[in-house]
Amino acid sequence: MYCVEDRFRQGLTEEEREGLTATEAREANKQRLRSPHLLLLAETDEGLQNLYRLNYYAATQGFYGKPRIDLKLLAKYSKGLIATTTCVISNMARYFQNKEIDKMTGFFNDIAGIFGPDNLFIEMHPHDLDMQLEYNQVLIEMFRKEYEGFKCILANDVHYVRKEHNDTHNF
């Protein structure tokens, strides 16, 4: 992420500069490959600096196949960030798939303790996959009962909109 803002915004008009800087933060855990992740978005300038810090530490201290962070580091640099629970490769979804609902809610409680209801969103996807549909239903039921203050977002796991955005995405 080094200098991403400067390089990405170079030559853009003021209107074209609108947007949020975000990253899929992979979690350092025992499961070394295809580690679960959270989506982190910089809401403020301080959040942007924290996003840079997290990416720096992920690349220099947590790298194992991919840059990774742990929840302790995330808690230290969470101010100004918004998080979402992401897709079916998230910790919560994996716990659900393994029928470990206690671990699923435990993980959510951990990240809820870091971000709170104003900066953590439960992410659901409209994909017509049995696994996704079941996971969405569990999220709806669980969060209606236990986590009323948290909001849901509907996402599509789209990393870029147009083919020509690929260069910026892979930047």
Where do the model's predicted regions map?
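Phosphodiester-processing cores and adjacent nucleic acid-binding clamps
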Residues: 1-171
